Amino acid sequence: MKKDVLIERIEELVRPIVSELSCELYYVEYVKENGEFYLRIYIDKEGRVSLNDCEAVSRRVSEILDVEDPIKEAYYLEVSSPGLNRGLYKEEHFKKYIGSEVLIRLTSSLNGVKSVKGLLRDVSEDSILVEGETEIQIPRDKIKAANLEGEI
């Protein structure tokens, strides 16, 4: 199964569980690190995500993944909050944090810089607007990584 199809399938399986437990599915990633596979599920909610939230989601998700078995190789399941310096992966993440301080790392130099730090001012389907020392319109396909900076 292709990785993006696998992630979609896992999101379909776990989203209802995460919602039942009063949390929001923030992001899912499946990676290989040092020869081991990791399924990482990031959850969020109003207020703070607690260790108990992560444990409850982990238990329930583990049960459904054991039954549905979408991943054929051995893997480690990790459930956590996305953290204060959370990654911004989807358009909805960018839109949620308009007005927040962000750090954007670029795939290649844009206007002589490889990273931009500033306030996220606007989001469109194909670009974001960040106000740092100057305003810069960044095409979405030039974003290597995007993270919140500081408190949310």
Swiss-Prot record:
Q: Do you know which NCBIfam families this protein is assigned to?
A: PRK00092.3-1
The family assignment reads: Belongs to the RimP family.
Q: Which Pfam families match?
A: DUF150_C, RimP_N
List localization entries: Cytoplasm
Which Gene Ontology cellular component annotation is one that this UniProt entry carries? Answer: cytosol
Family annotation (SUPFAM superfamilies): YhbC-like, C-terminal domain, YhbC-like, N-terminal domain
- Per its database record, what is this protein's job? Required for maturation of 30S ribosomal subunits.
**Which keywords appear in this protein's UniProt record, sorted alphabetically?**
Cytoplasm, Ribosome biogenesis
Signal peptide positions on this chain: none
HAMAP family, sorted: RimP
Q: What is this protein called?
A: Ribosome maturation factor RimP
Species this chain originates from: Clostridium beijerinckii (strain ATCC 51743 / NCIMB 8052) (Clostridium acetobutylicum)
**GO terms (BP aspect):** ribosomal small subunit assembly; translation
